[in-house]
UniProtKB/Swiss-Prot annotation:
Protein name stated in the entry: 5'-nucleotidase
Annotated site residues (Transition state stabilizer) in this chain: H120, D123
Reported function: Catalyzes the hydrolysis of nucleotide monophosphates, releasing inorganic phosphate and the corresponding nucleoside. AMP is the preferred substrate but can also hydrolyze CMP and GMP. Shows a preference for ribonucleotide monophosphates over their equivalent deoxyribose forms. Other substrates include IMP, UMP, dAMP, dCMP, dTMP, NAD and NMN.
Residues binding Zn(2+) 1, per UniProt: D38, H40, D87
Cofactor: Zn(2+)
Tissue: Expressed in the brain.
Protein family according to the UniProt entry: Belongs to the 5'-nucleotidase family.
Organism expressing this protein natively: Rattus norvegicus
Enzyme class at the top of the EC tree: hydrolase
Lipid-anchored residues (GPI-anchor amidated serine): S551
Gene: Nt5e
Length: 576
């Protein structure tokens, strides 16, 4: 007779079965993705609003602090990537002087694994991208939807790639890049680069990676949060999307600073084929380091993803060697930071959160300077030959803090107006101006750069109406008058307007200005116009004056349920 087989107690079997889901599988693999986007030349630490650092204990970001955190994570975790989603170029005196050499130098020191091209990488033309950056970096720069043609094709061949396969901890990870197809309207890429639709261009490159047996694929790019989500939904085979361009702040839990989250981090998109795809951005200006943990199964499917942007505040020390290197590069910039142009006794709000959504006093200052620069007194019938100014909110890049004794330097202005354009004089019909103001708000709320700041103009919008029918009132300051007053815009009348050369060329989608302008005279450099005005005024205090207004319907539409609730509350009170 055979002995009975030994059986485990039922309680032990139950306990083991409960632990099985927690037991690590040999096939799963975890990747840490550190990421930045829209740094915009913030190599030094800045104040909390990304202006010049005034109190070191309250300052954030900078490459020396970023280096410390990146090195710490690399030492603590086995499988790590450091990625950048574009727009390292443009934003402070650093780029004005060094023109991209500083970007290549410090990104190499940080050891980036890959970067996507942003629209601002083309601000100095293709040559301003090739020589300072593409030929000097030690990591791949990516974009799958930019195609070179003509004489540029052989010149730029191999300097940027559609994708790159990286080896990380014994696994292979594919990184595929993309860039906003609107770049020709936003920057200066020239005519020999074609910017294709992102989704259409990405799919065949992802398919190529799949044929190479790469089953973990990150889309890294610079087209904005809406496009990031669309790529996650539509491009088969993309596992993670790391984006930029819209300075989107995502966070799970209580945010550590003043940025308001646009959603949880990571933001999960369900793809058309049923996968859960994490999408991330890390705000802008080097204030945060994006930190995403992704677990893949043996087939390359995302099992879990979690993390949060890390606020790079003063609790993280600045690396001494990188800081010393920054100080050496800084010497060449000192002349720009010591010359005082004038003083402000109010905060000059040039933030994207303000100037791309409503009237901002920095926009008012710039427009007032532009009109002042064009003061001419042709005869006794006219107090001036031009009274109107428009400036795209996306061209205003930084605030100026009045708490540094109110001092305004050339360096401060270079952060506000970093593009080096001119303020030009044009003649336009009233009908063209009406089209321009409809364009200003046709996609209002997306933090896009076409929202217009004004001078000599009063405009009222109703955002509850459909796009291209949102301007409900448009008045302009008369010029042929002894006492200037605001008069309704006349569609067939020809008006003079001062505006950035960028808009003259159709930038930010203002094609109607380029196509319909009747006369154009080039003006003075933008930063010179504003600096001379500040020097003349000595002390400035621009206000928000009601130049741009939104009708009551715009506000009521979003609050309709609250209005109904309030109505019934009043009825109940009356009849109690």
């Amino acid at each position: 007779m055979r002995p009975a087989a030994a059986t485990a107690p039922k309680w032990l079997l139950l306990a083991l079965s409960a632990l099985l889901p927690l037991w690590p599988t040999a096939k799963s693999w975890e990747l840490t993705i550190m990421h930045t986007n829209d740094v915009h030349s913030r190599l030094e630490q800045t104040s909390d609003d990304s202006t010049k650092c005034l109190n070191a204990s309250l300052c954030v970001g900078g490459v020396a602090r970023l280096f410390t955190k990146v090195q710490q994570i690399r030492k603590e975790e086995p499988n790590v990537l450091l990625l950048d989603a574009g727009d390292q170029y443009q934003g402070t005196i650093w780029f004005t002087v060094y023109k991209g050499l500083e970007v290549a130098h410090f990104m190499n020191l940080l050891g980036y694994d890959a970067m996507a091209l942003g629209n601002h990488e083309f601000d100095n033309g293709v040559e301003g991208l090739i020589d300072p950056l593409l030929r000097n970096v030690k990591f791949p720069i990516l974009s799958a939807n930019i195609k070179a043609r003509g004489p540029l094709a052989p010149q730029i061949s191999g300097l940027y790639l559609p994708y790159k396969v990286l080896s990380v901890g014994g696994e292979v990870v594919g990184i595929v890049g993309y860039t906003s197809k609107e770049t020709p309207f936003l920057s200066n890429p020239g005519t020999n680069l074609v910017f294709e639709d992102e989704v259409t261009a990405l799919q065949p490159e992802v398919d190529k990676l799949k044929t190479l047996n790469v089953n973990k694929i990150i889309a890294l790019g610079h087209s904005g949060f809406e496009m990031d989500k669309l790529i996650a939904q539509k491009v088969r085979g993309v596992d993670v999307v790391v984006g930029g361009h819209t300075n989107t702040f995502l966070y799970t839990g209580n945010p550590p600073s003043k940025e308001v989250p646009a959603g949880k981090y990571p933001f999960i998109v369900t793809s058309d084929d049923g996968r859960k795809v994490p999408v991330v951005q890390a705000y802008a200006f080097g204030k945060y380091l994006g930190y995403l943990k992704v677990e893949f199964d043996d087939k390359g499917n995302v099992v879990t993803s979690y993390g949060n942007p890390i606020l790079l505040n003063s609790t993280i020390r600045e690396d001494a060697a990188i800081k010393a290197d920054i100080n050496q590069w800084r010497i060449k910039l000192d002349n720009y930071s010591t010359q005082e142009l004038g003083r402000t006794i109010v905060y000059l709000n040039g933030s994207a959160q303000e100037c791309r959504f409503r009237e901002c006093n920095m926009g008012n200052l710039i427009c007032d300077a532009m009109i002042n620069n064009n003061l001419r007194h042709p005869d006794e019938m006219f107090w001036n030959h031009v009274s109107m100014c428009i400036v795209n909110g996306g061209g205003i890049r930084s605030p100026i803090d009045e708490r540094n004794n109110g001092t305004i330097t050339w360096e401060n202005l270079a952060a506000v107006l970093p593009f080096g354009g001119t303020f030009d004089l044009v003649q336009l019909k009233g009908s063209t101006l009406k089209k321009a103001f409809e364009h200003s708000v046709h996609r209002y709320g997306q933090s896009t750069g076409e929202f217009l700041q004004v001078g000599g103009i009063h405009v009222v919008y109703d955002i509850s109406r459909k796009p291209w029918d949102r301007v409900v009132q448009l008045k302009v300051l008369c010029t042929k008058c002894r006492v200037p007053i605001y008069e309704p815009l006349e569609m067939d009348k020809v008006y003079k307007v001062v505006l950035p050369s960028y808009l003259v060329n159709g930038g930010d989608g203002f094609q109607m200005i380029k196509d319909e302008l009747l006369k154009h005279d080039s003006g003075d450099q933008d930063i010179s116009v504003v600096s001379e005005y500040i020097s003349k005024m000595k002390v400035i205090y621009p206000a928000v004056e009601g130049r741009i207004k939104f009708s009551a319907a715009s506000h009521y539409q979003g609050s309709f349920p609250l209005i109904i609730l309030s109505f019934w509350a009043v009825i109940l009170v009356l009849y109690q």
